[in-house]
Amino acid sequence: MIVRFDEISDDARIWIYQSNKLFSNDQIKIIKNRIQDFLNSWTSHGNELKVASKIKYCYFIIIALDQNTSLASGCSIDKMVHFIKNLENEFGVRLLDRLDISYKINNEIFISNLKDFKDKILEKKIDNTTIVFNNLINLKSDLTNCWEIPLSKSWHKQLIK
């Protein structure tokens, strides 16, 4: 059962898939339809799942699952990863590459590979106050306080040495 993102519980499990390229408005419409179709058929051991999704900043696909009603099984998570891989192929983007790092400078979002991110740190274009996206969070409640955070408070800080 699909619900609005703001209606799903704060303790819902989330998955964040970050694109290495900005999605256009036309692409977002198509992607939202694809996500809707996938979520309508997404089950765990035959049980319907209470789910929600959103696309944030034209880069991030966020899928939420209310685990109070049903838990995702390994097979259901595999189906989601397969779905995400299909989106990668269809739109020519990377959504599963955890070595792409996203950050904000002057409210503009940038995506860099790990090497470029480290180079920007050395060039002093990125510092401890730079806002980074911690896509490793896994609860909806963490989107508010733990997703967009200063580099100094994220796992990314280990890259500054």
Q: How should each PLM-predicted stretch be described?
A:
Residues 96-161:
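Terminal interaction module
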Residues 66-95:
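Helix-adjacent hinge/juxtasegments
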Residues 48-62, 66-71:
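Short, intrinsically disordered low-complexity segments
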Residues 1-4, 161:
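Short, Lys/Arg-enriched, disordered terminal segments
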